[in-house]
């Protein structure tokens, strides 16, 4: 057994938890064993002992030098994350200061852009940007590039005095797509027969508050009528609620039928022998009322309704 075998004994199979810790030592042991085999093959048996002794005397010095290296003096910082992950930090120092120094040095250097990278057909100017002598810190970057907490200014609302002044400009009315022209399309006027104003809000059809000055702008095109305006009860005074011509000169309600005689049959409508369909076929029919109340067109008294229910079979037959 040589001195190497005494100093560096062969270990068993590495365990899974200690494999990373003993890997360098196993590599060193394999390297030394190969060196010893090469010396034994090349040297004579008499000189093999002196060679091995000289090699063994040099080995502890090299190991001490490796142990005294700065890497051994500064072990990595281990941070336990979970049962399967451990974070080792080999960097020593303040990370934030190193990162700031790196970026400040990179921004102070000239740009790496070269005009030779572009095609020869592209026009080239003699400005500092093309000359690659313009540092990045002096370029016109937006404020959000240098300050991450920068907030853009909020634009003024549409109902503010700035928006009102913008609508009063001479070119505002000439543009058909300007907010003033669009607002004028929606507020054309109350002279049209289908235009009506809702009493519960001042601007019935415009969802945006663009200010009072925008409503005064004129528009060359009429706005389309909404569905609820076409079918509104105030569609046209010439038509009734059922879009039928209004009948003039007729009573709003049917006259109450007189009470029958005590000896008359229950199905008799009146003492004069009035036919059953006279109340429906007359000018005061239920579907000719000009007013918006349908119940007025069906002006039947309680007695007439009771008679119709009693003799409904004879009337419908």
From Swiss-Prot:
Q: In which tissues is it expressed?
A: Skeletal muscle.
Q: Where along the sequence do coiled-coil regions lie?
A: none
- Could you tell me where the Basic and acidic residues compositional bias lies? 63-76
Q: Which Pfam families match?
A: Vg_Tdu
Residues covered by region (Disordered): 41-76, 108-128, 191-214, 253-293
Transcription regulation in keyword set: yes
Q: Name one GO biological process term.
A: positive regulation of transcription by RNA polymerase II
**GO terms under cellular component:** cytoplasm; nucleus
Q: Which InterPro entries match?
A: Vg_fam
Q: Where in the cell is it found?
A: Nucleus
What molecular function does GO assign, one term?
transcription coactivator activity
Q: Which residue stretches does the UniProt record annotate as biased composition, category Basic residues?
A: 196-206
The protein's UniProt keywords, in alphabetical order, are: Nucleus, Transcription, Transcription regulation
Major subcellular site: nucleus
Please note every region of biased composition (Low complexity). Answer: 44-57, 108-120, 272-292
* Family stated for the protein in its record: Belongs to the vestigial family.
Subunit arrangement?
Answer: Interacts with TEFs. Binds to TEAD1/TEF1.
Described function: May act as a specific coactivator for the mammalian TEFs. May play a role in the development of skeletal muscles.
- Protein name listed in UniProt: Transcription cofactor vestigial-like protein 2
Source organism (scientific name): Homo sapiens (Human)
Organismal lineage: Eukaryota, Metazoa, Chordata, Craniata, Vertebrata
């Amino acid at each position: 057994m040589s001195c190497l075998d005494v100093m560096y004994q062969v270990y068993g199979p590495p365990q899974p938890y200690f494999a990373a810790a003993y890997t360098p030592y196993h590599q060193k042991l394999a390297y030394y064993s190969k060196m010893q085999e090469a010396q034994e093959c090349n040297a004579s048996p008499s000189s093999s002992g002196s060679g091995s002794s000289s090699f063994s005397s040099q080995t502890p010095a090299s190991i001490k030098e490796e142990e005294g290296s700065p890497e051994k003096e500064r072990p990595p910082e281990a941070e336990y994350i979970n049962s399967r992950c451990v974070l080792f930090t080999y960097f020593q120092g303040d990370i934030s200061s190193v990162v700031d120094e790196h970026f400040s040095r990179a921004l102070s250097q000239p740009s790496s852009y070269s005009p030779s990278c572009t095609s020869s057909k592209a026009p080239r100017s003699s400005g500092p940007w093309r000359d690659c002598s313009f540092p990045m810190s002096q370029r016109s970057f937006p404020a959000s590039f240098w300050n991450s907490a920068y907030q853009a200014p909020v634009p003024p609302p549409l109902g503010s005095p700035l928006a009102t002044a913008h609508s009063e400009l001479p070119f505002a009315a000439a543009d058909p797509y300007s907010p003033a022209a669009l607002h004028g399309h929606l507020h054309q006027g109350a002279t049209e027969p289908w235009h009506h104003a809702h009493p519960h809000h001042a601007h019935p059809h415009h969802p945006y508050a663009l200010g009072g000055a925008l409503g005064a702008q004129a528009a060359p095109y009429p706005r389309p009528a909404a569905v609820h305006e076409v079918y509104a009860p105030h569609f046209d005074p010439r038509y009734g609620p059922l879009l039928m011509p209004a009948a003039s000169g007729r009573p709003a309600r049917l006259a109450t039928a007189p009470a029958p005689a005590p000896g008359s049959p229950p199905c008799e409508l009146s003492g004069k022998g009035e036919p059953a369909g006279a109340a429906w076929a007359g000018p005061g029919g239920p579907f000719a009322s000009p007013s918006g109340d349908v119940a007025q067109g069906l002006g039947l008294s309680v007695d007439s309704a009771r008679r119709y229910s009693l003799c409904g079979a004879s009337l419908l037959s």
